């Protein structure tokens, strides 16, 4: 493989696709992982109506489209739509010919074996890639933080995972998947804003709620006290200007929405909070590596971007862990894209070049080769 050909790194999440070139320090293209189909054929006569729209274009036209999310909770559920997203990524966003570049894809922890094989098959047979690799998202985030051992809390739009990793290998028996992530926090914020007299019902308004969440929400270090403390309310209240110029004020909703991560019961969800999930995952690991995991709790993904989250996790884990244990929570500033960045680092290492699954290996062994080479 000549040095000049850059590998492509594609991290497709339940909410957002991050894609670009290995060796770059940030993804080149970031767009929503959605596919939209026109509700009525021929509504846009003379506009060159397409059969399907992907990403930002689907987002802007969503009023006249049926929107589909091909990835739910981190796992592909519709292969035809998924193929459209890959096609769009290669040809429209990155503007590359996939048959000319090695491709590194990411996958959710505990991704079913059949899914890995299907992805491998599509890459080699539909897109004709010369070589391919698939890597677990949380492991890439850990690499991006400069570690090979630690426990990653990775939370995106559709799913969260707690993944303990020892010397570069994830420990599947101790992974916790939590079906609570960014989309649920947006829903919850929409609910509590509606309770305080604002109306957000359309999909466009839902995007506004997501924007409010990303710009104004934070994690409280003492939720019960902050809920009781009415004097403190004036100091935390912020205003938000809607697209139509109307200004709304947001008070304790700012910290009530992300609190769901620690207290899913606030929405009647029978799930454990993220701190409990991190602790449980560490306790499933061998006693000899726990100390190292406690000291290297690494945050990753867009839903870990709230101010106060790292400190709150630290406090909650301190309360659960043995008192002598030193706890470290690492929140890299670029963690929104750390899975992609880890992939970019990995795919450009000279030592990694022998790891790729080549087209010849695929032709000889079929899709199951992926389990032998990517783990």
From Swiss-Prot:
Enzyme Commission number, as recorded: 3.6.4.-
A Gene Ontology molecular function term of the record: ATP binding
Keyword Transport in record: no
InterPro entries according to UniProt: Actin (IPR004000), Actin/actin-like_CS (IPR020902), Actin_CS (IPR004001), ATPase_NBD (IPR043129)
EC class name: hydrolase
Keyword annotations: ATP-binding, Cytoplasm, Cytoskeleton, Hydrolase, Nucleotide-binding
Primary residence: cytoplasm
Catalytic reactions on record: ATP + H2O = ADP + phosphate + H(+)
Domain of life: Eukaryota
UniProt subcellular location: Cytoplasm, Cytoskeleton
Pfam families noted in UniProt: Actin
An example Gene Ontology CC term for this record: cytoplasm
Its biological purpose: Actins are highly conserved proteins that are involved in various types of cell motility and are ubiquitously expressed in all eukaryotic cells.
Database matches in PANTHER family: ACTIN (PTHR11937)
Family: Belongs to the actin family.
Protein name: Actin
């Amino acid at each position: 493989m000549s040095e000049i050909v850059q590998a492509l790194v594609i991290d497709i999440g339940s909410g957002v696709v991050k894609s670009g070139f290995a060796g770059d320090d940030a993804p080149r293209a970031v767009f929503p992982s959605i596919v939209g189909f026109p509700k009525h054929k021929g509504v846009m006569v003379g506009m060159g109506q397409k059969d399907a729209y992907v990403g930002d274009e689907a987002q802007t036209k969503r009023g006249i489209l049926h929107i589909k999310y091909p990835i739910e909770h981190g796992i592909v559920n519709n292969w035809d739509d998924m193929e459209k997203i890959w096609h769009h990524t290669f040809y429209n966003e990155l503007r590359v010919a996939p048959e000319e570049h090695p491709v590194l894809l990411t996958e959710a922890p505990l991704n079913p074996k059949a899914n890995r094989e299907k992805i491998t098959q599509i890459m080699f047979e539909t897109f004709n890639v010369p070589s391919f690799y698939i890597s677990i998202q949380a492991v890439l985030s850990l690499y991006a933080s400069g570690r090979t051992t630690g426990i990653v809390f990775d939370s995106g739009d559709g799913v969260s995972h707690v993944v303990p990793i020892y010397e570069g290998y994830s420990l599947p028996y101790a992974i916790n998947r939590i079906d609570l992530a960014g989309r649920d926090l947006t829903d919850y914020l929409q609910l509590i804003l509606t309770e305080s007299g604002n109306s957000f019902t359309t999909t466009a308004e839902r995007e506004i709620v997501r924007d409010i969440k990303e710009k104004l929400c934070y994690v409280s270090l003492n939720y019960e006290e902050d809920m009781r403390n009415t004097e403190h309310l004036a100091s935390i209240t912020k205003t938000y200007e809607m697209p139509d110029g109307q200004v709304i004020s947001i008070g304790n909703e700012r910290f009530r929405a992300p609190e769901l991560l620690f207290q899913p019961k606030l929405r009647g969800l029978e799930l454990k909070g993220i701190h409990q999930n991190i602790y449980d995952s560490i306790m499933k690991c061998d006693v000899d590596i726990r100390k190292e995991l406690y000291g290297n709790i690494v945050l990753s993904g867009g839903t870990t971007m709230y101010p106060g989250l790292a400190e709150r996790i630290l406090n909650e884990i301190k309360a659960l862990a043995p008192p002598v244990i030193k706890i470290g929570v690492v929140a890299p500033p670029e963690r929104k894209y750390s899975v992609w960045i880890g992939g970019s680092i990995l795919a450009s290492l000279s030592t990694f070049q022998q790891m790729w699954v080549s087209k010849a290996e695929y032709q000889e062994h079929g899709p199951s080769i992926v389990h032998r080479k990517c783990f």
